[in-house]
Amino acid sequence: MSRSSPRALPPGALPRPLPAAPAAVQRALLPPWPRRAGRRWPASPLGMKVFRRKALVLCAGYALLLVLTMLNLLDYKWHKEPLQQCNPDGPLGAAVGAAGAGWGRPGSPPAAPPRAHSRMDPRTPYRPPAAGVGAVPAAAAGSAGAAASLGNATRGTRGGGDKRQLVYVFTTWRSGSSFFGELFNQNPEVFFLYEPVWHVWQKLYPGDAVSLQGAARDMLSALYRCDLSVFQLYSPAGSGGRNLTTLGIFGAATNKVVCSSPLCPAYRKEVVGLVDDRVCKKCPPQRLARFEEECRKYRTLVIKGVRVFDVAVLAPLLKDPALDLKVIHLVRDPRAVASSRIRSRHGLIRESLQVVRSRDPRAHRMPFLEAAGHKLGAKKEGMGGPADYHALGAMEVICNSMAKTLQTALQPPDWLQGHYLVVRYEDLVGDPVKTLRRVYDFVGLLVSPEMEQFALNMTSGSGSSSKPFVVSARNATQAANAWRTALTFQQIKQVEEFCYQPMAVLGYERVNSPEEVKDLSKTLLRKPRL
């Protein structure tokens, strides 16, 4: 047998395996990895292994993100959409209440009288207990016990009705609304909130002013029911959301309820006087649930806002039979508003941009304002720059919205009759006590000597207005007429062009010459039509 021929194997025997080739030979024998245009592929099995690991990690990350998203949605639905509450006024609610508390059952023990400040579901509107249903007669409880059970709910109010009185101070920026709001913030019988819709505008920025009106109304609807958890929906990113406290609410550092006992020992609610925000910021933060409990103790709830542009936006709230809402429309000479906006233009630049975005692009504009806004080389800090342009441009939207509101008020629908009051800032600073009494009578509050003295002190001080966002005692005459020396005649005519309709209704006379503007002995106030 030749040496080159293979040796025959016995029957049933397996051939002996050949020795393994070196790794370099194996790689050389492998076919080249397929390549596609525009796509890189691993050049070796080791690269393929790394590629597969990266793909697995990426898929696992996407799966984890999907799971976390679903858990977040379930957590939101669990906390923000509780079980449907049974309507106590409906047939089913009455039946459940009778079965649970024994009302109306023969031989059952009488129900205990409700506590004056018991915690209730924040989404349930304030409803006083009906006479004869689960309530102990006053004769049985005694007059002293009945008065003690009411507590602060009826103190200092006119009439003593059972329904909670709700008030919305409807105004715009730089109209003296901070001072006007203090007339309610300082009242011991009032729960006051300072511009809560600010949270909506900040969260939904850069939405224009008109598109945010519905969200603003929804927030007010919740707040008037003492559902303060609505602040969590619009809390800033990274602020904790569900862990938001009282000090995270806009304007809380000067709120008398937040800074007074029992929430904070720094002040006493019954003592009239401005709150120092530096002191209030040191108060311990309180949970919103605790703030809600304080809200339900007050029979009068007042919200001041500048971000609702038309009273018709509030129509659903005014029509709601569960809410006894009244609107106080605080107005000011639009020329004074424009002057104050220019002076504080950099502090309001964000809001001015949101308002300017709501302008009608078909509206006529006077050429000098457009030139001022796009002036080449204009400095941000100088007059005639972009900040001035937005400050004056916002007046167009503000005055158009004011004209719609005043037109509605001149021919009020049923939902507005008896629920609307116009207050001019010039009348407030000219005769603060008379205006205070008129406002308090409208909302059913009693005027105390301390509040009268507070109003007088705030309008007869000598403080400077160099800080436009700080409430302080100032000279009323200087504050009302400052625009006549601060604005140019062209700026005055621009504002009058935008605002001639509301000016005519509210009794603000237009000027014809620069000399007439500078003549401070001549009043430009006339009797308003409202």
Swiss-Prot record:
Query: Which residues are involved in binding 3'-phosphoadenylyl sulfate?
Result: 173-179, 332-340
Disulphide bridges in this chain?
none
Query: If you read the UniProt record, what top EC class would you report for this enzyme, in one word?
Result: transferase
Pro residues compositional bias: what residue ranges? Answer: 8-20
Transmembrane segment boundaries: 55-75
**Could you provide one GO biological process annotation from this protein's UniProt record?**
carbohydrate metabolic process
Sugar-modified residues: 243, 457, 475
Tissue and organ expression note: In brain, it is expressed in pyramidal cells in the CA3 subregion of the hippocampus, cerebellar nucleus and Purkinje cells. Expressed in peripheral lymph nodes.
Query: Annotated region Disordered: where?
Result: 1-20, 97-128
Q: In which pathway does it act?
A: Protein modification; carbohydrate sulfation
Q: Which reaction does it catalyse?
A: 3-O-{N-acetyl-beta-D-glucosaminyl-(1->3)-beta-D-galactosyl-(1->3)-N-acetyl-alpha-D-galactosaminyl}-L-threonyl-[protein] + 3'-phosphoadenylyl sulfate = 3-O-{6-O-sulfo-N-acetyl-beta-D-glucosaminyl-(1->3)-beta-D-galactosyl-(1->3)-N-acetyl-alpha-D-galactosaminyl}-L-threonyl-[protein] + adenosine 3',5'-bisphosphate + H(+); 3-O-{N-acetyl-beta-D-glucosaminyl-(1->3)-beta-D-galactosyl-(1->3)-N-acetyl-alpha-D-galactosaminyl}-L-seryl-[protein] + 3'-phosphoadenylyl sulfate = 3-O-{6-O-sulfo-N-acetyl-beta-D-glucosaminyl-(1->3)-beta-D-galactosyl-(1->3)-N-acetyl-alpha-D-galactosaminyl}-L-seryl-[protein] + adenosine 3',5'-bisphosphate + H(+); a 3-O-{beta-D-galactosyl-(1->3)-[N-acetyl-beta-D-glucosaminyl-(1->6)]-N-acetyl-alpha-D-galactosaminyl}-L-threonyl-[protein] + 3'-phosphoadenylyl sulfate = 3-O-{beta-D-galactosyl-(1->3)-[6-O-sulfo-N-acetyl-beta-D-glucosaminyl-(1->6)]-N-acetyl-alpha-D-galactosaminyl}-L-threonyl-[protein] + adenosine 3',5'-bisphosphate + H(+); 3-O-{beta-D-galactosyl-(1->3)-[N-acetyl-beta-D-glucosaminyl-(1->6)]-N-acetyl-alpha-D-galactosaminyl}-L-seryl-[protein] + 3'-phosphoadenylyl sulfate = 3-O-{beta-D-galactosyl-(1->3)-[6-O-sulfo-N-acetyl-beta-D-glucosaminyl-(1->6)]-N-acetyl-alpha-D-galactosaminyl}-L-seryl-[protein] + adenosine 3',5'-bisphosphate + H(+)
Q: Where in the cell is it found?
A: Golgi apparatus, trans-Golgi network membrane
- Which UniProt keyword terms apply here? Carbohydrate metabolism, Disulfide bond, Glycoprotein, Golgi apparatus, Inflammatory response, Membrane, Signal-anchor, Transferase, Transmembrane, Transmembrane helix
Q: Which Gene3D superfamilies match?
A: P-loop containing nucleotide triphosphate hydrolases
User: Where does it sit, as one GO cellular component term?
Assistant: cytosol
Known EC number(s)?
2.8.2.-
Gene Ontology MF terms in the entry: N-acetylglucosamine 6-O-sulfotransferase activity; sulfotransferase activity
InterPro entries assigned: Carbohydrate_sulfotransferase, Gal/GlcNAc/GalNAc_ST, P-loop_NTPase, Sulfotransferase_dom
The knockout note for this entry states: Mice are impaired in the elaboration of sialyl 6-sulfo Lewis X in HEV. Lymphocyte homing to peripheral lymph nodes, mesenteric lymph nodes, and Peyer patches are significantly reduced. Simultaneous knockdown of CHST4 and CHST2 results in lower contact hypersensitivity response when compared to wild-type littermates.
Q: How does it sit in the membrane?
A: Single-pass type II membrane protein
Intervals, Cytoplasmic compartment: 1-54
Q: What is its main location?
A: Golgi
Q: Describe the task this protein carries out.
A: Sulfotransferase that utilizes 3'-phospho-5'-adenylyl sulfate (PAPS) as sulfonate donor to catalyze the transfer of sulfate to position 6 of non-reducing N-acetylglucosamine (GlcNAc) residues within keratan-like structures on N-linked glycans and within mucin-associated glycans that can ultimately serve as SELL ligands. SELL ligands are present in high endothelial cells (HEVs) and play a central role in lymphocyte homing at sites of inflammation. Participates in biosynthesis of the SELL ligand sialyl 6-sulfo Lewis X and in lymphocyte homing to Peyer patches.
Q: How does it assemble?
A: Homodimer; disulfide-linked. Homodimerization is not essential for enzyme activity.
The record's similarity note reads: Belongs to the sulfotransferase 1 family. Gal/GlcNAc/GalNAc subfamily.
The name this protein goes by in its record: Carbohydrate sulfotransferase 2
**Species for this entry:** Mus musculus (Mouse)
The root-end lineage is: Eukaryota, Metazoa, Chordata, Craniata, Vertebrata
Q: Name the gene that codes for it.
A: Chst2
